[in-house]
Amino acid sequence: ENYPRTLDLLNKWFALESNPAPEPYILQAQVFYQLQRYKEMVAPIETAMRIARERDKEAKEDWYVLLNFAYFQDENYAKVKDIQKILLQNWPKKRYWFSLAGAYTELGDDQNLIAAYDAAYTQGMLEKENEFVTMAQLYMQREVPYKAAILLQEQMEKGVVKKNEKNYRLLSQAWMLAQEDDKAIPALQQAASRAVDGELDVRLANSYLNIGEYDECVSAANDGLRKGSLKNPDNAQITLGMCLYNLRKYSDAKKAFQAAAKVQKSRRMSNQWIQVIDAEVERNRQIQLKLRRDGPSLSDLPDFIVSFMH
């Protein structure tokens, strides 16, 4: 179509018309749109809205959509935000929530960004996997990982969010940040079983260490070291050593700490653990020597036997 010709005719008509209705101004804005003269769209749309108000008429939804587009092209996100609020107030639709969220993203307003997602979720407007995953990530950014974990868990159980390594990894991270290691473990197990590298196995080992499940900790740490491709294998060795120490497997624990000590940043901690192990082994050796020489004394016997004897 000949949009420049249309624009020229409109301008001539405006020059002759003393009291135009809103619609011709909207037509003018649409012509500017077709000509990709987006900044020039704003004035006629706002004029149309002003005339509508003066005549006690409501501005139409598509007028606001057109104005929103013009401001978006001009990267005026503050105006985009304001228009989306009007659209939501009068025509609450899913796409307007996400447009509002996009404006908050561009403005760096994380608090209101999450509020927009929350409102969309409360109204049942979140449907797709990426929408729920994005919302969970926003919760974690705002340091409310428990809500992120609950959201992901629910949507994975419903089948909306896929049960893959990436999503299980995110779920486990949310539970761990919420200091819910017992709930992080099932997600970590699922993620680790799907992972090629050993990072998630080591993370799983740390969760087992935190809740005192030392046999499982050893198994997971060894799996991680076996798979390899670890960013910090020394940390994996330290975790393994701590779990072995708690199982009183001092020789194996010492080997793990010796392996970790080969890395400069872990050397001091590892050597401290080695000293603790050596001291514990020596203490046990002295006890055994004393028992062989003198027989058991009350101080060498377990507390429950001493109590029984008394």
Please place each PLM-identified region on the residue numbering.
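Alpha-solenoid helical repeat scaffolds
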Residues: 1-246, 252-286, 292-310
